[in-house]
Curated annotation (Swiss-Prot):
Belongs to the major facilitator (TC 2.A.1) superfamily. Organic cation transporter (TC 2.A.1.19) family. Glycosylated. Glycosylation is necessary for proper targeting of the transporter to the plasma membrane. It comes from the Eukaryota. Its main location: membrane. This is Solute carrier family 22 member 6. The gene is slc22a6. It is found in: Cell membrane; Basolateral cell membrane; Basal cell membrane. InterPro entries: MFS_dom, MFS_sugar_transport-like, MFS_trans_sf. Gene3D superfamilies: MFS general substrate transporter like domains. The lineage of its organism: Eukaryota, Metazoa, Chordata, Craniata, Vertebrata. GO terms for cellular component: basal plasma membrane; basolateral plasma membrane; plasma membrane. Keywords: Cell membrane, Membrane, Transmembrane, Transmembrane helix.
Length: 560
């Protein structure tokens, strides 16, 4: 009897699994809120220098004061980061068209905003930008805050991944929920930008812990036949979370209250997480079979199969877990990802795919203001496009194969982003449409690469492989915000990089072997025997893909 048969005995799709998956999915709704929170708490409102402090606004019209103190740029708008050293009252004698640009005024001495900035707060009441004046010389700090957050996600994946295998999924899930709740609360009450960044790093680490342990607990308590459906459902929870963020941000315009609103739900999830049962698989592999038997009997009781649960004993459990226990004794490491030429090709190509997908995805998603429309509306559109994108790529993966779907999604995303560079800025509808298509393609690429990577890596090192490519994705998300700084002098550079990276990685993906209808490899030797050159020409009979075969030695952990 395999463990899957044991799970069927106590009920694999009963009341317990419904409650278990539902409660574990609830925090996923709020994960997108923290990943994309920067779009709203760090939105940059229109701003310009405050007039000289010694000027009396009561005796002079405010518009005239601005004309005399803040120069106009070539676009006819007030300069954001400089003002005249002394008020130029003679400008008021010129008509509007003459004062837009005058050679003599171009040579007038200017200075930085010595008395601070004036912010047009029509869309929000406060952001970290207005709170700490993160504009002009300090504008890079906005991108740095998102980079540090993604750095926390990266560190959390490394830390919580190891701790989870040592101390269990349930304990780490409790810690992650509490860490996210407290970290988010501290972010909301930050008194300095440094404090803000420190606690955002904590939130990033907690998010990784939530992702890793939530998905582990989900897949380890459900049968193989429903993993595809459940995995798709939890993925749509993240998509729904993007829509929730837009709605909450629209209602709460203050960055502190908004941060608090998306953090408080984690206190609730922390409280009900005490109810979760530890994975029976993990308990057996860590030499605690007695507790595993108790948990299985609890599942049987909740599912109304108490009689079947009473039949389970230590001997039956250990017999069902023989294969898992044998696999756990293997001496494999991350170095095995590069052991052979075939493994090196797979690892290098997947690294490029994951890095570029995450890099371009967050590059587009974290710069909503450039589209010139309401950031709340564009957030809803960007979130909604994931729904059809994931459906389409799922169909394509089943009919055309993994490799063409992965290549096509990446190349099409890159083309959409590059074409957008050629569209005039006044054609906002077209620019937004192209960006939405590009973002949808990147979401489809994410959907594809999770399945593709899991099918390419053999069972004995699948967890190490997924951990490595996930780390590359986090690294891409860290770098993405900083690329936006290159657009200060050359606005086309970020778009060129964001568009070029997916196309290049799409070429890398072409060198990956096809896995549609192929059996899951169990060892590195299986990968070498299959061979890159023979992948498309030779298919084995009775083939099973990742969605249908139970990876009993090492369970695939996904991250959103």
């Amino acid at each position: 009897m395999a463990f899957s048969d044991l799970l069927e005995q106590v009920g694999s799709t009963g009341r317990f699994q419904v409650l278990h998956v539902t409660l574990l999915s609830m925090p996923i709704l709020m994960m997108a809120s923290h990943n994309l929170l920067q779009n709203f708490v760090a939105a940059v409102p229109p701003h310009h220098c405050q007039p000289h402090a010694n000027l009396s606004m009561s005796s002079t019209d405010a518009v005239d004061v601005l004309r005399a103190t803040v120069p106009l740029g070539l676009n006819g708008k007030l300069e954001r980061c400089k003002r005249y050293t002394t008020p130029q009252w003679q400008i008021l004698s010129l008509n509007t068209s003459e004062s837009l640009w005058d050679e003599s005024m171009a040579e007038t001495e200017t200075q930085s905003c010595e008395d601070g900035w004036f912010y047009n707060m029509t869309e929000m009441s406060s952001t970290i930008i207005t709170e700490w004046d993160l504009v002009c010389d300090y504008r890079a700090l906005k991108q740095m805050s998102q980079t540090t957050y993604m750095g926390g996600v990266l560190v959390g994946a490394i830390v919580f991944g190891g701790l989870s295998d040592r101390f269990g999924r349930r304990v780490l899930l409790l810690i992650s929920n509490l860490m996210m709740a407290i970290g988010g609360t501290c972010v909301a009450f930050s008194t300095s930008f440094t404090m803000f960044c420190v606690f955002r790093v904590c939130c990033g680490m907690a998010l990784s812990g939530l992702v890793l342990n939530s998905f582990s607990l989900i897949v380890e308590w459900i049968p193989t036949r429903v993993r595809t459906v459940v995995g798709t459902g939890t993925g749509y929870c993240y998509t729904t979370g993007q829509l929730i963020l837009a709605a909450v941000a629209y209602c709460i315009r203050d960055w502190r209250w908004l941060t608090l609103a998306v953090s408080l739900p984690f206190y609730v999830s922390f409280l009900y997480s005490w109810w979760f049962l530890e994975s029976a698989r993990w308990l057996v592999l860590t030499k605690n079979p007695e507790q595993a038997v108790k948990n299985l009997k609890t599942v049987a009781r909740i599912n109304g199969r108490s009689a079947e649960g009473d039949k389970i004993d230590l001997e039956m459990l250990q017999e069902s877990m023989k294969k898992e226990m044998a696999c756990s004794k293997g001496s494999y490491s991350a170095l095995d990802l590069l052991r052979t030429s075939t493994m090196r090709t797979i690892t290098i190509c997947l690294s490029a795919v994951w890095f570029s997908t995450s890099f371009a995805y967050y590059g587009l998603s974290m710069d909503l203001q450039k589209f010139g429309v309401s950031i709340y509306l564009i957030q809803i559109i960007f979130g909604a496009v994931d729904i059809p994108a994931k459906i389409i790529v799922t169909i394509c993966m089943s009919m055309l194969g993994r490799r063409p779907s992965q290549c096509g999604a990446l190349v099409l995303a890159g083309i959409m982003i590059l074409i957008n560079l050629l569209v005039p800025s006044d054609l906002q509808m077209l620019r937004t449409s192209l960006a939405v298509i590009g973002k949808g393609c990147l979401a489809a690429s994410f959907n594809c690469c999770y399945l593709y990577a899991g099918e390419l890596y053999p069972t004995v090192i699948r967890q190490s492989g997924m951990g490595w490519v996930s780390m590359m994705a986090r690294f891409g998300a860290m770098v993405a915000p900083m690329v936006l700084l290159l657009g200060d002098d050359y606005p086309w550079i970020p778009g060129f990089i964001y568009g070029g990276a997916p196309i290049v990685s799409g070429i890398f993906a072409f060198f990956l072997p096809e896995t549609l209808s192929q059996p899951l490899p169990d060892t590195i030797q299986d990968i070498d025997d299959r061979g890159l050159a023979r992948t498309n020409s030779k298919r084995l009979p009775e083939k099973l893909d990742l969605a249908m075969k139970d990876p009993s030695c090492v369970l695939l952990k996904e991250s959103v």
